[in-house]
Amino acid sequence: MYPTRRMSNKPKNKSKRKEEKSQEMSTNLKYLSLSILVFQTTSLVLTMRYSRTLKEEGPRYLSSTAVVIAELLKILACVLLVYKDSKCNLRTLNRVLHDEILNKPMETLKLAIPSGIYTLQNNLLYVALSNLDAATYQVTYQLKILTTALFSVSMLSKKLGVYQWLSLVILMAGVAFVQWPSDSQAPAAKEHSAGSQFVGLMAVLIACFSSGFAGVYFEKILKETKQSVWIRNIQLGFFGSIFGLMGVYIYDGEQLSKNGFFQGYNKLTWVVVVLQALGGLVIAAVIKYADNILKGFATSLSIILSTLISYFWLQDFVPTSVFFFGAVLVIAATFLYGYDPKPAGNPIKA
């Protein structure tokens, strides 16, 4: 008898190692993207707040111009990403941009509506952070979860589960507690604070509604067409820069003619602009590599960091027990909204 030959397990082991390596890389990318999201969200809010309240000689930078520059930087970043997807070939890049943007004018025009709304939202965030401390802004801005959910139900016919509806109720209660007036201030300071807080709150609320509508509208466009998210962001940035420039000349034309487009710009201003430009790209990466629960964790961590830094560094915020209670409710609602209960498996029959 001839000895039987054993089949080698090397191909199987090699395939298993390759799969494990791929899973490890995916996990690393997931947590890397979430870490970047926490850093970007927290640092943008804090630096924007600091830049709008910092007392300096000369004119303050125009927030409307910062929005335009952020849109232009976003276009540049997305073009570089399309270039990477085109295997770093300029001819391929040129063909892709020509075919997907210039040759499809009606598809490109679809982005005009969400782009205009996003431009309004970005300007409102500067107004909000000029009148609210970073911690209060961060917590209140989570109302965009509510508006996004409602627009998803009405525009995309999305069905929400019991946990999601419950989370929206908890979210509204949490934001109400966060906005609860404090009795610790003097009457004069309290009156001034109430006025500016009302302006900031209105700016955040309008930004939440605009964010919810534009986000769902953009999602609908992405689902109905096959264009890449980077191409769509280039189209958004194109219209955003046009609408932004219109806003600059309509609302800040007089100051612009006196002191120029880049009046009041310094290193901190450029940090704010770059962070704002990268925001959409970071969100896209998180959507690709992470899930809603981890995104909720990142948002919660960002709120906590903003609260601590506002108290210890900016010193423009004194947390109360009511604020903490409201913040805990908002964080819990964020987790609950992303919670996806898995149905119990069928019992094994004997």
Q: Where are the regions a protein language model picked out?
A:
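Polytopic endomembrane small-metabolite transporters, centered on the Drug/Metabolite Transporter
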Residues: M1-A350
